Amino acid sequence: MKSIVSKAQQYLEQERNSRFSEEIKDFETPKIVVVGCGGSGNNTVHRLSNMNVSSAMTIAINTDKQQLLRTKADKRVLIGRSITRGLGAGGYPEIGRKAAELARNVLEDLLCDSDMVFVCAGMGGGTGTGSAPVVADVAKKQGAIVIGFAQMPFRVERARIQKALDGLEEMKEVCDTVVVLDNNKLLDYYPNLPIDAAFSVMDQLIAETIKGISDTITIPSLVNIDFADVKAIMGHGGVAVMLVGEAKAQDKANAVVRDCLSHPLLDVDYRGATGSLVHISGGHDLTLKEAEEIIRNLTFEIDDYANVIWGARIDKEFEGFVRVVSIMTGIKDRDFVGSLSYENVLQKQKLRDIRVESRNNGEKLRKQQSFSEPVKFRREKQKVSIPIIDRL
């Protein structure tokens, strides 16, 4: 048995370099496209481009010309030129939606023949919230599997919350799977992290997740993810939650699972999830036993008949530690207002709206009761009957 193991290790490097024959190379790989809509989506695409991702084409879409010029992507599309003159949507989703609708023909050409499309956007603004559902709809009608990454606003961004929730509902209608990411969770886990740094961390998480999935589908890895399996899980995944964890400890298999389960990026009950896509990144010291242990412990509480697929990638940058990204699909908990930690904010807004409405109604009532000119009151003359007393 030892000799077999020795020979396997001896020829491992050779097998890595000659994994595909010329005949297999003739087959086309899945066409994967990542579209970043608005400022947040552009940031994700920019990071992916800086990672030199070769397994997916990146497209940046915006109504803001200056933001678009600062974004690195394979394709950059300025939409709504006639509406916004390249100055942005001003936080109005309806403008972002109209701009995307006017560019529908351009989007159809860009997304033609795509097999999988990731649509990334921050919810609550103008361009991302309005254009992302349109982009997802175009990709869906082109026959692609559409996976949305919806980044929800911080609690302090009060004006964006209701717009974000409305945008999320639209994304759910047109995407096969929507991975919902709550920015507030980062502040809960890292309370001293500045807001701009928190945005940066979330952008990095999304970019590395997409790169990991794309690379494992299209580039030879330790354990590849089959595109058909991804399609089976993501094709009807509904709402999904992303778990991320890292560990450097000696017992890193258990440590990374604990880190994942204690840092979900959406506060929902994922124990009844119907699908799980797990991607493991590790160094050459990552063993098959550790990988199997990670998968088993991470998916222990999900549905017994859940479709679980996993991939593993070996990278020298991960020597001594392991990173796990898991996407749980088919989440049954649909109470997003509760899960997104917006109850207090929305309740305050509701009470404020009630007070404003009450004040407005009071002003209207006072106006109705006021008089434009003084009223003269007249005392009506009354006829008084005086009894007649006969003179004696």
UniProtKB/Swiss-Prot annotation:
GO MF, one annotated term: GTPase activity
InterPro entries in alphabetical order: Cell_div_FtsZ, Cell_div_FtsZ_CS, FtsZ/CetZ, FtsZ_C, Tub_FtsZ_C, Tubulin/FtsZ_2-layer-sand-dom, Tubulin/FtsZ_GTPase_sf, Tubulin_FtsZ_GTPase
SMART domains from the UniProt entry: Tubulin, Tubulin_C
The keyword Cell cycle appears for this protein: yes
Keyword tags: Cell cycle, Cell division, Cytoplasm, GTP-binding, Nucleotide-binding, Septation
Transmembrane segments: none
UniProt keyword annotation of Cell membrane present: no
One of the GO BP terms on file: protein polymerization
One Pfam match: FtsZ_C
SUPFAM superfamilies the UniProt entry points to: Tubulin C-terminal domain-like (SSF55307), Tubulin nucleotide-binding domain-like (SSF52490)
Binding site for GTP: 126-128, 157, 160, 203
Family: Belongs to the FtsZ family.
Entry function: Essential cell division protein that forms a contractile ring structure (Z ring) at the future cell division site. The regulation of the ring assembly controls the timing and the location of cell division. One of the functions of the FtsZ ring is to recruit other cell division proteins to the septum to produce a new cell wall between the dividing cells. Binds GTP and shows GTPase activity.
NCBIfam families for this protein: ftsZ (TIGR00065)
Assembly and binders: Homodimer. Polymerizes to form a dynamic ring structure in a strictly GTP-dependent manner. Interacts directly with several other division proteins.
Protein name: Cell division protein FtsZ 2
Species this protein is from: Archaeoglobus fulgidus (strain ATCC 49558 / DSM 4304 / JCM 9628 / NBRC 100126 / VC-16)
Gene (name only): ftsZ2
